[in-house]
């Protein structure tokens, strides 16, 4: 019965319409494997389906892979349209094509992996079970590092496995998210060989390797690769819930400061983190009295405060997207700063200013020409802890966080996800923070403007999370 059904499906997939429809539907289902749905088990099945469909049409394998991931990335990253059209007001005449532009570029990397895979000889077991997972992992690494102008690791297979009950997440602490990506691709490949291989010996071998991959992940999940040091410390992540359209309105500056001041006064946590650009003015332009009031409020409560704020460079010619600590007279006499290193192209710097200047005017985007901070910046000293900060989507670059994390005892992300409204972007970024916490074996404090503000454990699990679109303070002990 199974063989007859399999044969009928094989004939059906040879009809171009049904083949293309199957590719599109499977690709469109990939967002379900990621946050906020966390159906991690889906991704090996979906990727395995792509492998089998690609094998059915070897002459069109590269095109099939490209179209699959064009649909997949467009589905996963539809929040690009949310940011440009719904929040920034860009007309759909421009917003829709631009939404598909990045997926169209990103899909070139999977297509290249399948193009190389097609050229490999040898047995099917070798090509599917060994070569393809290796090529896929290299393509994902290249996509993170070598996208023209910037890297972009969102949507990597490995992130789909950063979930509480996923066994494959166990590979993250030993070799990072790329190891999880390899394990996911390998599991998918060997599942294909298990289901679609003749001979019981070959199927038994495939079953053993599937069990080995899953079993190794389960074992690694039980291991502790870091140890707690020192005493527990209380932390707080502040969520202001400031609408993006009002954030840089000068008439809203004082109400914004008052809101954050009231929230800071509520907490007695030792470490308090505010979101990216929580203070909307340049640091040097803020009235000194305002900064003093925040520092004094934190000091009265036994807190040390880190705030997201734009700041001019020392020469005053450029500006930074920064997190600064507000000094107090007892514990933190000097101001410390972390400046964002990975800037968002077209959002925080202008790769092609002659072409993109009209676009910025249409989208009414403030602060779109930041200067990069340096690489491997030192952690900030707060309440006896060394806190390695990253800003916005920087927590998607795990390789860049290794050096700062080695010097740190805590990780912290300060973000403003109001650009993406209620889309899945905030949840996908939270999943990346979970990956970084798991890789580095450290707690992650996430302070965002509207969500998802959360505390993540060294095991990559969400300890506590604040409701989205509500102003408040999320407290925990780490």
Give the role of each language-model region.
Residues 136, 141, 177, 242-243, ...:
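Short acidic/polar capping segments at secondary-structure boundaries
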Residues 113, 260-264, 377:
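Generic structural signal for well-ordered alpha-helices
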Residues 75, 142, 147, 152, ...:
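Residue-level signal for pocket-adjacent positions within structured domains
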Residues 162-166, 212-296:
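Membrane-interface segments at or immediately adjacent to transmembrane helices
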Residues 2-222, 422, 433, 448-459, ...:
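Membrane-embedded alpha-helical bundles of multi-pass enzymes
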Residues 255-258, 276-478:
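Solvent-exposed soluble domains appended to multi-pass membrane proteins
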Residues 96-101, 242-248, 362-363:
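Short glycine/proline- and acidic residue-enriched helix-loop micro-motifs
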């Amino acid at each position: 019965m199974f063989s007859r059904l399999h044969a009928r499906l094989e004939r059906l997939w040879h009809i171009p319409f049904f083949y293309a429809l199957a590719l599109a539907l499977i690709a469109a289902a990939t967002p379900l494997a990621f946050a906020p749905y966390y159906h991690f088990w889906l991704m090996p099945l979906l990727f395995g389906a792509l492998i089998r469909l690609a094998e059915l049409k070897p002459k069109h394998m590269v095109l099939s892979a490209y179209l699959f991931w064009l649909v997949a990335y467009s589905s996963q990253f539809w929040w690009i349209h949310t940011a440009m059209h719904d929040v920034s007001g860009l007309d759909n005449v421009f917003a829709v094509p631009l939404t598909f532009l990045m997926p169209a570029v990103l899909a070139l990397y999977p297509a290249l992996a399948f193009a190389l895979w097609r050229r490999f000889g040898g047995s099917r077991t070798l090509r599917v079970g060994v070569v393809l997972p290796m090529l896929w992992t290299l393509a994902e690494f290249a996509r993170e590092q070598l996208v023209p102008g910037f890297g972009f690791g969102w949507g990597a297979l490995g992130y789909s496995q950063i979930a509480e009950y996923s066994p494959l997440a166990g590979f993250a602490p030993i070799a990072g998210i790329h190891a999880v990506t390899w394990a996911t691709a390998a599991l998918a490949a060997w599942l294909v060989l298990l289901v679609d291989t003749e001979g019981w010996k070959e199927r038994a071998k495939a079953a053993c390797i599937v069990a080995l991959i899953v079993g190794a992940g389960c074992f690694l999940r039980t291991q502790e690769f870091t140890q707690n040091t020192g005493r527990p410390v209380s932390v707080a992540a502040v969520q202001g819930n400031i609408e993006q359209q009002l954030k840089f309105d000068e008439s809203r500056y004082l109400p914004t400061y008052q809101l954050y001041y009231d929230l800071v006064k509520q907490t007695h946590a030792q470490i308090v983190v505010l979101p990216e650009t929580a203070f909307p003015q340049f640091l040097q332009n803020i009235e000194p009295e305002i900064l003093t009031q925040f520092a004094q409020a934190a000091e009265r409560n036994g807190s040390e405060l880190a705030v997201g704020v734009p700041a001019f460079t020392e020469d005053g010619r450029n500006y930074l997207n920064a997190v600064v600590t507000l000094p107090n007279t007892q514990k933190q006499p000097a101001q410390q700063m972390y400046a964002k290193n990975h800037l968002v192209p077209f959002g925080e710097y202008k790769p092609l200013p002659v072409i993109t200047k009209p676009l910025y005017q249409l989208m009414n985007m403030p602060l779109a020409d930041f200067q990069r901070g340096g690489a491997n910046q030192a952690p900030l000293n707060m309440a006896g802890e060394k806190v390695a900060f990253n800003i916005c989507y920087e927590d998607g670059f795990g390789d860049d966080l290794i050096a700062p994390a080695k010097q740190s005892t805590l990780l912290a992300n300060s973000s403003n996800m109001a650009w993406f409204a209620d889309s899945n972007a905030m949840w996908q970024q939270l999943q990346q923070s979970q990956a970084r916490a798991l890789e580095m074996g450290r707690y992650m404090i996430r302070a965002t403007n509207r969500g998802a503000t959360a505390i993540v454990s060294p095991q990559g699990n969400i300890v506590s999370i604040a409701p989205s679109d509500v102003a408040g303070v999320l407290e925990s002990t780490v």
